[in-house]
Amino acid sequence: MGLQISIRESGDVTILDLRGKSTIDGGESELLGGCLKELIANGVRKLLLNLADLTQVDTTGVGVIIGKYISLRDRGGELKLLCPCGRVLEVFRVLRLLQFISSFEDETQALASFRPKGYVARL
């Protein structure tokens, strides 16, 4: 299966649910890069990549994620990861990606991490 991308929002955080694989040979990394580039160009500054259903990523896919992380950081934004697992997690660990890109196992905690410190939700 190639890469499928679903986009949803939670407050001011844009969440990309990735399913399948992100590799150079199938053009999936280019698809991911184009999607992220368009979101950033349209003003998105808080991105959460849900990797729970991403089964494979190669160095091209990792390069896309790192490039967009840097692009967002330089614009005052943030890119974070949700639920990297299996082979994807192994690749991220080997490349030490998780040392500078925040990663979460729980979506609620990931979303809360985008809020300013001391933020209290008003009911």
Specify the residue positions occupied by each region the protein language model found:
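General small-molecule cofactor/ligand-binding pocket signal
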Residues: 6, 82, 104
